[in-house]
Amino acid sequence: MQEQYRPEDIEPQVQLHWQEKQTFKVTEDNSKEKYYCLSMLPYPSGRLHMGHVRNYTIGDVISRYQRMLGKNVLQPIGWDAFGLPAEGAAVKNNTAPAPWTYANIEYMKGQLKTLGFGYDWDREVTTCTPEYYHWEQWFFTKLYEKGLVYKKTSSVNWCPHDLTVLANEQVVDGCCWRCDSKVERKEIPQWFIKITDYAEELLSDLETLEEWPEQVKTMQRNWIGRSEGVEITFDVADSQEKLTVYTTRPDTFLGATYVAIAAGHPLAKQAAENNPELVAFIDECRNTKVAEADMATMEKKGMATGMFAIHSLTKEKVAIWVANFVLMEYGTGAVMAVPGHDQRDWEFATKYNLPIKAVILDNEGNEPNVHEAPVTDKNILFNSGEFSGLNHEAGFNAIANKLVEMGVGKRKVNYRLRDWGVSRQRYWGAPIPMATLENGTVVPVPADQLPVILPEDVKMDGITSPIKADPEWAKTTINGQPALRETDTFDTFMESSWYYARYTCPDYDKGLLDPAAANYWLPVDQYIGGIEHAIMHLMYFRFFHKLMRDASLVNSNEPAKRLLCQGMVLADAFYYIGKNGEKIWVSPADTIVERDDKGRIVKATDKEGHELVYTGMSKMSKSKNNGIDPQLMVEKYGADTVRLFMMFAAPPELTLEWQESSVEGANRFLKRVWRLVYEHSSKGATQPLDITNLTVEQKDLFRDLHKTIAKVTDDVGRRQAFNTAIAAVMELMNKLTRAPQETEQDRALMQEALLAVVRMLSPITPHACFIMWQALGGEGGIDTADWPQANEQAMVDDTKLVVIQVNGKVRGRVTVPADATKEYVHDLAAQEYGVAKYLEGVTIRKVIYVPGKLLNLVVG
């Protein structure tokens, strides 16, 4: 061990050792408890960012800790390699997506290795390789055969810039989540997987995920959106047509005064045949904002169709309107409007001067003035004929039953969740394994013709997918008949929905999964990723697992037992106004700042002298140019320091503020540990510690050591509060640096303490701990060392500090043996000057003793 801590010397040396010894390679071993720790796989964008580093450091710390508990730990890594960014980069760099992607993977793989992550690299998967997507295509054809896949023309969210379909979740404020272009509505044929068949199970099984964040489960519950209600059929006046609506409030049915239908509803099309104004309005609706958040806040617009529905109970005519807030994709494409008891319906009725009727009393039990505001609470019914006087639940059931008896109603459970549209009109994705025969029949590509390989040597024009532009690529033969291949590719969420299972058997060539390997490792014990994936990836991830279970590929119901959603990494952001009024963002690395006495930034300039506006801490991003390159930090401080800072700066689920001064602090701490280990080990071997023959000071330090082990074990294992675990080790280190080293027992105790400190830090700072363990003469290598065990007896205090009160007021404190009697403590307390003066000339009427904590003398 060298005297100075130089990570640039030791880290490559330790990483080479891991590589040569294949330290983290694992196989199935039924004699050991397994532990599968997984961080969400990265997209190979070109360089790691600090968000990656935080995610993967958390995963590596958990994995290394579990190894030290003696478990058979799988920690794999791979690449979510398909996707739009590769197409944009290929056009920009005049190349194809494949070489750009593979080059990025190689570079980022090197970055991961320099950070010391303990991956089993033999299990690496790259989702854009035929070896991977072969089995995805095969599974899709099996789902098709089971009736879980279908194709239909549907109205979709269309990004005119990326020329592709967006899921509702990918529309943010009416714009594309990726490029911010305004989203349009478009009718195109799409492939869908029936996730709605699993809606109830996806919802109910959330209850079994006890170690998932409640926030994620709530987001999924809301997205699935289960509701119980009634489907009501109206007759259309002067027509043979019927109109069906779904409502969760049948108790308000007597207050329905109009019906709103979607622009794509058959009745809307029928009404528009001789109405050019309605045609124009329907066209406007097709390009309206489509995300649900937008639906809630946008201006409500409508137009009368001139048609009327017949109210099923009152037989009154209610007008049918086309409204921009009703979508064909949700429910029946029509809603009954009760403006007296629904805010949206009320706004619409007020705007267009439609009737508003009250049928629910207000919270005080009075008849409300619904022309001023709607009453949306579930109160007592009135003005509802035979149903007046019923409460919400009774009214719901009575009206529902009546409609069912009349044959115009049907109780129904509805879900907000829509089927998963998996078609994308881009090139860089896995080809959808379907084909169309000359007679128009659509068939799956047979298993012996899979995979349908995506050509990688292509020219990108940035507009048309190369496989759509090349008519020859689509030509194929299915069972001897000419056919045309599907030229759409899979949504990239397909690849990331099952990669975790493929890690268990990455080289298996007889099917999607090797059931023996998959069922040894699955479910994942610990999954780590951002909260932003709660309702897309994490929903599809759960859905795919259930599909694989029902195909007898896995035995478990859920893919992951425990989920940790790490917070974002924030950094200072600065800009100045350019010549054309635009914001020019300046990297924190290129700024000079002045701070006040509280450390707050009060002035900032860049290296060219521009005075900068400081906008505070925000998520590291390219748009604000405030990303910090992990590579530069590793080169400057070493991987262990970066890892230590990431784990210490904040609890893992909260945002982390990047402060280089704090990184320097982490580096100083590591140097302090290194120096103490060096000084201790350079004095030679120590004798075994005799715990039966310790001085009072040695006992105190021994007790502190084992209390620290207990706390760190709980913080890392159960609480995942890594920052407080590190703080506890730092506190112990402060005591160790002050501990006397005069006797053999002193040195033996220091040896035991440092062996424990190095083991507790090794999941976080593995390179330095590898070397320090060797220097201390630790048994075997640190990579096979056991986690230190807390000695329960050692943690018991020999003495207690007892608070002394007189008439309930604190007057002193005394240190007593842990087993001291009330009489002993009383006698000792009476001799304390601070207590004794309050006992002069008074009578002690009562003595209250809480053993080891408090003595209260009641005097009078």
UniProtKB/Swiss-Prot annotation:
One of its GO terms (molecular function) is ATP binding. PROSITE patterns: AA_TRNA_LIGASE_I. One of its GO terms (biological process) is leucyl-tRNA aminoacylation. It comes from the Bacteria. ATP binds at residue 622. It catalyses: tRNA(Leu) + L-leucine + ATP = L-leucyl-tRNA(Leu) + AMP + diphosphate. The gene is leuS. A motif ('KMSKS' region) lies at residues 619-623. PANTHER family: LEUCINE--TRNA LIGASE, MITOCHONDRIAL (PTHR43740:SF2), LEUCYL-TRNA SYNTHETASE (PTHR43740). GO terms for cellular component: cytosol. It is found in: Cytoplasm. Transmembrane segments: none annotated. A motif ('HIGH' region) lies at residues 42-52. This is Leucine--tRNA ligase. Gene3D superfamilies: 2.20.28.290, 3.10.20.590, HUPs (3.40.50.620), Isoleucyl-tRNA Synthetase, Domain 1 (1.10.730.10), Valyl/Leucyl/Isoleucyl-tRNA synthetase, editing domain (3.90.740.10). Belongs to the class-I aminoacyl-tRNA synthetase family. Keywords: Aminoacyl-tRNA synthetase, ATP-binding, Cytoplasm, Ligase, Nucleotide-binding, Protein biosynthesis. Its EC number is 6.1.1.4.
